[in-house]
Amino acid sequence: MYIKRGIIILIIAVIAGLKGYSQEILSNEASYRVEYSYYYKRDSTKAGYLMDTYFLDICKSGHSFFYSRITQYRDSVKQASLAHGMDAYQASEVIRSLPRGLAWYIDKRYADRKVMYYTQLVWDVFRGIGELELPKWEIVGDTTILNGFTCNKAIGVAGGREWIVWYTPDIQLNEGPWLLWGLPGLILKAEDSTGCFKFICDNVGELAPPYYVLLSGDYNNTRSMDLAGAVRAETMYELDPKKFMSVYGFGEMQGPPIPKRYYIPLYLVK
């Protein structure tokens, strides 16, 4: 799947055409994929970035998933091992040597303007449900070329952060990475104003049917709460796992004190 000029992708945020899906279980069959490199920092005082590969899979039923390809592959190998008769320990050994990606992913549901934020903490998946807010974009006059596409610049706020983004009207999809969407074209690059987070599009294209997205929230124990609650739980887990284990009922963590941990949340809770 490589970026090709002139590819026409459905504009999925035509809300009127999605009303029939708003109150039912949506199909996870995806028809289009956009691949992003996600650069992020855990400590703003250190140079360089950590990186993960994230897929934006756009489903026919009017929603989209944004998830770590590395984590999804690791989980799929584990599930395949279990399906072939391995026990949990054996399946864990199979994936031990595989790289680890980030645990969080999101499901944007346009018909009812909801976002579902999933993150696996210990052995449970925490699902936070919130309003899918349309960022208030200001389109500025700058242009640039990215991957051969003419891109326009816009500035807006999403998830409590200010973002500078570049979108291309050549790809008629008002989508983008994470909670960034609603512009007249696909967002190819986004960076927050602090410089701690960046999304850069690498590839985009159609998926050979049928392709169904299967993620950790589909087969693990899930705890549901509001979006802010899930983000707070994730932040506590990253900064103070010992406290997290106690507060959320996983038991007391034994062993020596944990060294200070650094973490910058992507989503800023009010």
What residue spans do the PLM features occupy?
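Extended soluble regions of mature proteins
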Residues: 24-270
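Bacterial Sec-dependent N-terminal signal peptides
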Residues: 1-29
